[in-house]
């Protein structure tokens, strides 16, 4: 079993039960899924760029990404409806915990001038969004093979009802929030 999943079953559940006075273990918020999205605007001119992004996302998450397509045509961006413009991966279960563990313990500390992640990035429904400016912080990415530095969005979807519950859940997992 994964290290973070074990930690959730033993420590985190207990801590949250005490803090929020839940009557049942089933009320304790859990992480539902993690969505990693990479928007590739350059793919409009050059479709090879998207292939690189898909490859990198697959290395990072260990799962084949879904290529996202444009919903509308936007003339100023030279964009037609249905053009591939990004890639996303939805992680659940074992892979989700592995990715979160890697993100918290390896990748985030590798960010330059890292002071912690923002406490304000919750959406009001208990979900947390995190923007990463470069894919090089992940250990799977080889610095020499990177054609262009790209960022990505990481959304952690929880079953928590409030932001406070979600913040406490992620803090118990070891998410480095800013002081």
From Swiss-Prot:
The keyword tRNA processing does not apply. This is one of the proteins that bind and probably mediate the attachment of the 5S RNA into the large ribosomal subunit, where it forms part of the central protuberance. In the 70S ribosome it contacts protein S13 of the 30S subunit (bridge B1b), connecting the 2 subunits; this bridge is implicated in subunit movement. Contacts the P site tRNA; the 5S rRNA and some of its associated proteins might help stabilize positioning of ribosome-bound tRNAs. GO terms for molecular function: RNA binding; rRNA binding; structural constituent of ribosome; tRNA binding. One of its GO terms (biological process) is translation. Belongs to the universal ribosomal protein uL5 family. Keywords: Ribonucleoprotein, Ribosomal protein, RNA-binding, rRNA-binding, tRNA-binding. The gene is rplE. It comes from the Bacteria. Pfam families: Ribosomal_L5, Ribosomal_L5_C. The keyword rRNA-binding applies. Part of the 50S ribosomal subunit; part of the 5S rRNA/L5/L18/L25 subcomplex. Contacts the 5S rRNA and the P site tRNA. Forms a bridge to the 30S subunit in the 70S ribosome. SUPFAM superfamilies: RL5-like. This is Large ribosomal subunit protein uL5. Gene3D superfamilies: 3.30.1440.10.
């Amino acid at each position: 079993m994964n290290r973070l999943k074990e930690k959730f079953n033993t420590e985190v559940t207990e801590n949250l039960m005490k803090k929020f006075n839940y009557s049942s273990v089933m009320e304790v918020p859990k992480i539902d899924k993690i969505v990693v999205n990479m928007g590739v605007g350059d793919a409009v001119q050059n479709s090879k760029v998207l292939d690189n992004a898909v490859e990198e996302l697959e290395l990072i998450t260990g799962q084949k990404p879904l290529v996202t397509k444009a919903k509308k045509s936007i003339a100023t961006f030279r964009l037609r409806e249905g053009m591939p413009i990004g890639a996303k991966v939805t992680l659940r279960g074992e892979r989700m915990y592995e990715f979160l563990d890697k993100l918290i313990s390896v990748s985030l500390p590798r960010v330059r001038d890292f002071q912690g992640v923002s406490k304000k990035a919750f959406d009001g429904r208990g979900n947390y969004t995190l923007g990463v400016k470069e894919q090089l912080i992940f250990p799977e990415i080889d610095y020499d093979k990177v054609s262009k530095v790209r960022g990505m969005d990481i959304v952690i979807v929880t079953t928590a009802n409030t932001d406070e519950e979600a913040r406490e859940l992620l803090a118990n997992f070891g998410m480095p929030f800013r002081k």
